[in-house]
Design a protein with these regions (language model features):
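Short catalytic micro-motifs in class I SAM-dependent methyltransferases
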Residues: 111-115
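A conserved beta-strand element that flanks and buttresses the S-adenosyl-L-methionine
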Residues: 108
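Conserved acidic residues
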Residues: 105
Length: 202
């Protein structure tokens, strides 16, 4: 486990990260209400404590959530049990998605893409494609640069051009829209919400 992943695991074990809001992200709820999410099988990559995954399961989707943090996965499983929701949670590195041996109609990434850059980002994008069905889709939300300047700490801010470049091969970008992340600190942060269709299987 990398140092960054160890830090995330410690955050889940001994605190409450700012992105844990004990509810689905508003942009995801809007996407569901608009019929954007296709099923039945949905994968939530970097699921954290399961806020989004549990919500999707409540909506009737067959949901698998993965996170590199075993502490986060344990919290997600507890949340699902408490709410009597059926969802599968797996402690797994995002680069090893193919080991799930399952393909999904929709893959969800709400908060992981912006952790990667360069060759690591390209490797991650390939891993996402490996678990998409033919014409499967990716709904991705990442921190954006349209609301501020890059900082020396905190999540990486992503430009729309970076998003388009990362998914220029093997994917068709359906749309990219301004959105926002809700946090448990009473603030919202600028984001991009993007929908992509996997085309390498065509």
């Amino acid at each position: 486990m990398s140092l960054k992943n160890i830090v995330f695991d410690l955050l889940y074990r001994f605190g409450k990260p700012p992105w844990v809001i004990d509810a689905p992200q508003p942009a995801l709820m809007a996407a569901v209400s608009q019929g954007v999410i296709r099923g039945p099988a949905v994968l939530d990559v970097g699921c954290g404590t399961g806020d989004n995954a549990v919500y999707l399961a409540e909506c009737g989707f067959s949901v698998t959530g993965v996170d590199v943090s075993t502490a986060a996965v344990a919290l997600a499983e507890r949340k699902a049990r408490t709410l009597s929701v059926k969802a599968r949670f797996v402690p797994l590195d995002a680069f090893q998605l193919a080991t799930l041996a399952t393909q999904f109609e929709t893959v969800l990434d709400f908060g992981l893409f912006h952790q990667f850059a360069g060759a690591t980002r390209a490797r991650y994008v390939r891993a996402l494609g490996e678990v998409c069905t033919s014409r499967g889709q990716l709904l991705l939300q990442c921190f954006s640069d349209h609301g501020g300047k890059a900082r020396w700490f905190g999540p990486r801010l992503v430009s729309q051009e970076e998003l388009r470049a990362a998914f220029s091969e093997g994917w068709r970008i359906e749309w990219i829209r301004p959105a926002s992340y809700k946090s448990n600190r009473g603030r919202e942060y600028p984001a991009w919400l993007a929908l992509m269709t996997y085309t390498n299987s065509e």
